């Protein structure tokens, strides 16, 4: 028998087994992503990306930027979140299937809170996380990396290349 849920239990004293499972999942995700902390209480990868973008916003930097090489379904969810909150959304173009960082460097990034990239991206290509992180951080924004947890066994982790937030879909794990 298997129990799967996107919900966090409200009564910790009667949910120790579920809490133990969530703790072990979060520990594994931290190891895979190279990040210090993990959350397990969002519905899916697209929602996680939208929540991460909302987390990065502040009064001076409220614009969300998403690479065009991110899964269109994820972009759609982020667009919905931005519409509901009134956050401006910018889609950064792609070039040869990868995030076009020349476009990033040419734009005014003073109001951009974060850039969301996906690696491997929607086209199956691996983004250059370190150079993207460098450019994004030099502009004062945060980098959100959306990644496939299975691919993280082979690829440089978001923590290694300097992402501020890592998000992903749990479905590839089974």
State the predicted function of each range.
Residues 1-48:
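Conserved N-terminal alpha-helix of the aminotransferase class I/II PLP-enzyme fold
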């Amino acid at each position: 028998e298997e129990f799967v849920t996107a919900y966090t239990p409200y009564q910790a004293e009667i949910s120790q087994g579920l809490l133990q499972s969530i703790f072990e999942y979060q520990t594994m995700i931290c190891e895979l992503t190279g990040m210090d902390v993990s959350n397990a209480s969002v519905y899916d990868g697209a929602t996680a990306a939208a929540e991460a973008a909302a987390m990065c916003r502040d009064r001076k930097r409220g614009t969300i930027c998403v690479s065009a090489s991110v899964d269109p379904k994820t972009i759609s969810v982020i667009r919905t979140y931005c519409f509901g909150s009134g956050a401006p959304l910018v889609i950064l173009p792609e070039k040869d299937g990868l995030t076009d960082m020349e476009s990033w460097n040419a734009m005014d990034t003073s109001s951009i809170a974060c850039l969301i990239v996906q690696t491997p991206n929607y086209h199956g290509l691996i983004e250059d996380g370190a150079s993207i992180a460098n450019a994004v951080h030099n502009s004062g924004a945060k980098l959100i990396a959306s990644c496939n947890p299975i691919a993280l066994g082979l690829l440089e982790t978001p923590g290694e290349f300097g992402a501020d937030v890592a998000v992903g879909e749990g479905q590839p794990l089974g």
